[in-house]
Swiss-Prot record:
Enzyme class: hydrolase
Protein name: Aminopeptidase 1
Cofactor: record remark: Binds 1 zinc ion per subunit.
PROSITE patterns linked to this entry: ZINC_PROTEASE
Species this protein is from: Schizosaccharomyces pombe (strain 972 / ATCC 24843) (Fission yeast)
Site (Transition state stabilizer): Y402
Sequence positions that bind Zn(2+): H316, H320, E339
Alphabetical GO biological process terms: cytoplasm to vacuole targeting by the NVT pathway; peptide catabolic process; protein processing; proteolysis
CDD domains, alphabetized: M1_APN-Q_like
Protein's UniProt keywords contain Protease: yes
Disulfide feature: none
InterPro entries: Aminopeptidase_N-like_N, Aminopeptidase_N-like_N_sf, ERAP1-like_C_dom, M1_APN-typ, Peptidase_M1, Peptidase_M1_aminopeptidases, Peptidase_M1_dom, Peptidase_M4/M1_CTD_sf
Pfam families: ERAP1_C, Peptidase_M1, Peptidase_M1_N
Amino acid sequence: MQVTIPKSTSKEDDKNRNLLPKNVKPIHYDLSLYPDLETFTYGGKVVVTLDVLEDSNSITLHGINLRILTAALEWGSQTVWASEVSYGDERIVLQFPSTVPANSVAVLTLPFTARISSGMEGFYRSSYVDSDGNTKYLATTQMEPTSARRAFPCWDEPALKATFTIDITAKENYTILSNMNAVEETVKDGLKTARFAETCRMSTYLLAWIVAELEYVEYFTPGKHCPRLPVRVYTTPGFSEQGKFAAELGAKTLDFFSGVFGEPYPLPKCDMVAIPDFEAGAMENWGLVTYRLAAILVSEDSAATVIERVAEVVQHELAHQWFGNLVTMQFWDGLWLNEGFATWMSWFSCNHFYPEWKVWESYVTDNLQSALSLDALRSSHPIEVPIMHDYEINQIFDAISYSKGSCVIRMVSKYVGEDTFIKGIQKYISKHRYGNTVTEDLWAALSAESGQDISSTMHNWTKKTGYPVLSVSETNDGELLIEQHRFLSTGDVKPEEDTVIYWAPLKLKTMKDGKAVVDEKAVLSDRSKKIKVDKEALESYKLNSEQSGIYRVNYSADHLKKLSQIAVEKPDYLSVEDRAGLIADVASLSRAGYGKVSSTLDLIKTWKDEPNFVVFAEMLARLNGIKSTLRFESSDIIAAMKKLVLEVSATKAHSLGWEFKANDDHIIRQFKSTVYNYAGLFGDDKVVKDALSKFDAYASGNKSAINDNLRSAVFNIAIRYGGAKSWDQLLEIYTKTNDPYVRNSCLRAFGVTEDEKYIQKTLDLTLDPIVKEQDIYLILVTLSTHKNGVLAMWKFATSNWDKLLSRLPVAGTMRGYVVRFVTSGFTHASAIDKIKEFFADKDTKLYERALQQSLDTISANSSFIDKSLDDITRWLKENRYM
């Protein structure tokens, strides 16, 4: 086994971080657990083999809400017992009467007791209702990022890798799972003890175990690139058939990744488990991957968006088995090495298995726009964000670490070439397997393979906050002048905020003899650059072909008109990615004051017959974004914007129809459902009538009345236009179903209501146990999109803040989500002071980033309204929407 000795990202960072003392280092853990799912308590014993690095009479390790019964330390022929055990700052400090000499191997034995948590962190319980209506419980784990310390005493830092041997004793009717395969199971007096094989060298945050009544489906890897091994999807009884898609895809994906990475999957099995209560979307525990129900279960009739989402999540988690598990970031400031790469790899793999889905087209409107949106705020953060305290870690599980991180990977892979990139990744994995790395290790491998200085060119992309807008103008000498400056959504960049120069691949697309050509190697590495082009190119140039660069492009109004017409007259010139990216850039830049919003509206009107789903959906999203930002403005302008969105969406909805045919492909199913939802919500008579009819039939028991692709849209439209009857019917649907997708559709739809009475009833659901804690934010998402919802939600949240927080786990990202949805819906700067006033006496350290990002979003929206309201009004009047 090749092992890389962990290194620090920075000695200064380690000095300032709240890390454990370095006098001892764990080598191996023997962990025994005895959970009781009736009392929700458990006993345990951990025996840790330690490498003693310094003379020591004190040992400090992590632990939260664990009661240590005794503490024995053995080395050589000596055994001593702790003279003092103290707790605090998420640590357990053990004092011993004797000193263990450096260079010893010692064994620490700690029996302990604890409660099985209810908070979706550490070792916790999850509930479900079985087919007989009985509430059942299972016990599972969520260790990432720093909750292993909630489950057992340990050294809970990613660089402190060790091996683990686990045995668990529980009632014999339970299935017991852990990272490795069970090598022995014994039953005595109604109790079953499962002992698992020793793990690979791994970080504590990847450890997992589950005790539950489960059933499973099983597939085997093809055996082409890794040994033939079982891949199982476990579910609570009655759901295993819905795990077939994920199990089969998982088996193929493990083999595929083994080939791509040049490193066979090292474990003898891979289990994937659907957990009823789960704070995140999924968790990549090595060999025992856990998921929300809605991230892994699908049926033959599931909506296209659901199937694609499950495929993406499964492949994301399995990519982690290499990027994150086999090779792990040194510390959490390198989280992007895990999440950015796994995100990119999931799209890479999805494109391999389902090329007809054309996922790289939607990547531009999904990951790229998510990254650009968050990173345009002053309160964004670098991809490699300094982390000094553990409570900061959960706040960087966001679109910067995931989406921007993956966009950096995509940008590099496009520039050096995919084959070269993959070979560099293989070198990186081979060199650092079972070890820890920093970003420079990745760049070194890619530099060695490509022959280019990747480390220098990519430095600012991971170390600095933000990204540039590239402004293009034409000189009198027939040249293109390209300048870069930092982009902020408020459009008010200060000189001191505009000091970073980014390396930006220009990917300049031009017309040559009527055909598209792309300069793949042109880059901007200074503040500005001039490029000589011919006359034909001057009429047709488009930067950032395929949107592979992480920046926006600002064209003159005249050139934007030329590009919009070229797209109509020569539809093959601008790719789907180009067109979607152009819409996104123009809309975002005009919101920030680079040009007029009327330019966005003109472009969308010109492309109203756009045939591609990704481009059309981006157009609708941008129109709806403008309308939504105007939620507190006059009823006249809101009505006019609604009329515009209705015209664009309804025309396409009627053109495509909303009956689903057997030969409808994956993309057309998404297209039909998207435009149906928009047309219905914005009041198309035929769509509303159809949706209400379908909903009544469904609520009366005819579950086949709604195609799965339309279910969310029908629920939304019914709540918007069906009144009290529909709201009550939807609540009954929610309480009676155990289908996670139906339940999620219900929760999102509740917030669509603009009726104040039913908004209040919807808000009351957030405190009602019938809504799982993991799902509270789903209600708030849609409430935050309309005026009545924003106002009522703020009043409710500020009146019930402690109750609301008590339903949200301390660890994880849920508190940040809730804060963001409760606060970010305001659109005038006057709201900022009242939000600050409310939170002034609150401990906001667990959601400080989310709060600041909300305030920045409000500032950006307020600035947008101040700059653009007159322009929008004029355009709507000139085009007869007002």
